[in-house]
A protein has these predicted regions:
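Short amphipathic alpha-helical segments, especially helix-boundary/capping motifs
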Residues: 1, 23-29, 49, 162-169, ...
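N-terminal Rossmann-like or analogous alpha/beta NTP/dinucleotide-binding catalytic cores
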Residues: 1-86, 180-181, 185-198, 255-258
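Non-catalytic terminal extensions that flank enzyme cores
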Residues: 104-105, 121-123, 215-220, 224-285
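A short, terminal or domain-edge coil/loop segment
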Residues: 53-68, 123-130, 135, 253-273
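Active-site cores that bind ATP or allylic diphosphates and position pyrophosphate for catalysis
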Residues: 62, 74-219, 225-230, 279, ...
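Short C-terminal domain-edge/linker segments immediately following a structured domain
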Residues: 32-36, 147, 193-196, 207-208, ...
């Protein structure tokens, strides 16, 4: 297991927050073999990858697939382009073919973001097929599901899709397990892996913890605050047991450790319990 602190956004760069995350992981019995690696300290690695996707460097030509994008967030949300299944917009290619003079004129007003071209819908290279370990066969046509996507924001912050692909590739990650809200990111990440020459890991997505109204639980709303639960229960067994029982890996009310769950884990079982887990007054004992 590789521990990576995904703190690309300057607002997320908090040593105290990282310390609390690691403390909570240890308390839950989740240890790691490598890290922690901080994305905020890897900007040069990401910049090199973007150069390879774009014009390249002297003596090492790139793929020529990136271009500057001047669209604002409000313009993108106001556009009539369709939206993908995860709610994000499908980029309409507004800035895709700007000439050099227009790029220079707009750049004088504000810095652009960097966007990556995807193949046309008719091009087989833009159709991504893979098998998720829980949700089975998946297919996405990049041109119709997302369009050209960001690899760097206008403020210079590297996009999540690019950063995790570079990190997974450079760190030798072979399996990625995460919430199913990121299932729609797989095709973009696999496209980047193929362009950059990285091995494609296996992906497994798991259910989310949601409120009774279906809202995804969030740290911002202090939903199911782990600090409060630590004070209430003292040990992690009841919490792990509550989650594991909803996934078919434990009996209702059973207290288990992370080590005990290792021997019980099965993707086949997870696939049969792939619905989101509702957290209400009956969730914890």
């Amino acid at each position: 297991m590789v521990l990576r602190i995904e703190d690309l956004d300057p607002r997320a760069q908090s040593p105290e927050a990282a310390r609390l995350i690691m403390d909570d992981l240890r308390w839950l019995g989740l240890d790691w073999d490598e890290g922690p690696y901080y994305q905020s300290k890897r900007s040069e690695v990401y910049a090199t990858a973007i150069e390879r996707l774009g014009a390249g460097t002297p003596g090492r030509p790139g793929r020529g697939l990136t271009y500057p994008c001047f669209c604002t967030r409000s313009e993108l949300h106001a556009a009539s382009a369709p939206h993908a299944s995860d709610g994000t917009y499908v980029y309409a290619g507004t800035c895709r073919n700007l000439n050099a003079a227009e790029v220079a004129r707009r750049s004088a007003a504000r810095p652009p973001a960097t966007r990556l071209r995807v193949p046309d819908a008719e091009d087989p290279a833009g159709t991504i097929d893979f098998v998720d370990m829980a949700y089975g066969p998946q297919r996405e046509v990049l041109a119709t599901e997302c369009g050209d996507f960001l690899v760097r924001r206008s403020d210079g912050v590297v996009a999540y899709q690019l950063a995790v692909v570079v990190d997974d590739g450079e760190m030798g990650v072979t399996e990625v397990v995460r919430g199913h809200d990121l299932l729609g990111s797989c095709a973009r990440q696999m496209y980047l892996q193929r362009l950059l020459g990285y091995r494609e890991p296996r992906y497994g997505h798991v259910p989310l913890l949601v409120a009774p109204d279906g809202r995804r639980l969030s740290k911002r709303e202090h939903d199911l605050d782990l600090g409060v639960l630590r004070e209430r229960y003292g040990t992690s067994g009841p919490i792990l047991g509550a989650v594991a029982s909803r996934l078919g890996l434990a009996e209702p009310g059973e207290s288990v450790t992370a080590d005990e769950l290792v021997g019980r884990f099965s993707w086949d079982v997870i696939a049969r319990h792939a619905a989101d887990i509702v957290v209400d007054e009956r969730f914890l004992p």
